Amino acid sequence: MKKVLFLLAVVSLLVSPVVAQAQDQPYSGPPKVIRIIREEVKVGKGTVHEANETAWARTFADAKSPDNWIGMDSTTGNNEAWFVSGYDTMSDMEKRTIQALNTVPALKAIDTKYSSQDGEFVSSTRSVVAVYRDDLSYQGLKTNVGLFRYLYVTTVRVRPGHESEFVEATKISRAAHEKAAVPERWSVFEVTEGMPRGTYLIFEPLKSMADVDAFPQTHGKVYQDAVGDDGRKRLAELNSSATISAETNIFAFNPKMSNPTKEIAAADPDFWTPKHAKTPVAGTKKGAEKPAGN
């Protein structure tokens, strides 16, 4: 699926199509700030790690934590679990995570309990903060993410001093998508902390793997005509000069490890809030290190 064109390699190809459906529900859109806790799960520890995370999420929800998050597992790439939280501002993130843990003893106790177990299941963690770039996004997440089951995540590294070329290429791509009315959507987040400067995350929600299969048809002649020969030439130039690397992986949403917002859970309650039996767990998770979010 990879193509030399910057647009296709970095945006189009990496975001497979999602056809709008009548069941799509109104959604307030992507958060302005996201926090991602990335955990690399040890080989053979996936089941016990999930049990620990499930108990953590349920206990936080029962304690009325002000923080929310979506948990997801990698299906490609490294064996990772991601926990993505959304906020209006950095101050909002501080209030709902650090301040909440420091001022509500029950939340602190829960966090301490479950975070202490992570060392047995996880080999490394990383906390990443990124801000939403509406100017680079196509349709954003105008459809409630709670209706989806997978997330295509493309991580783009841009050469220092070449951010303007990345922006130009992405806008060329978006314009072509708009002209061709391509039935997909993506949200671009610029990393501000936790990864090298010039890192961008492109999120594309998928309802099923059939969305990936549909990519060639979705980006067929109508789309190629919208890009045009001049556009393809320019994109190839931008790809060569602007990008260090682009990597795409697919994550599966894991409702058991999630503490979703009411808005997300309401999109599909049977999926996001199934009846849980009490999970016997050993442990704890990384409190302030583990967020909660959208």
Residue ranges and their predicted role:
Residues 4-5, 37:
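Small/flexible residues
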Residues 1-4, 21:
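Positively charged n-region of N-terminal signal peptides that target proteins for export
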Residues 7-16:
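Bacterial N-terminal signal peptides
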Residues 21-294:
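Short S/T/G/P-rich N-terminal loop/turn motif that feeds into the first structured element of a domain
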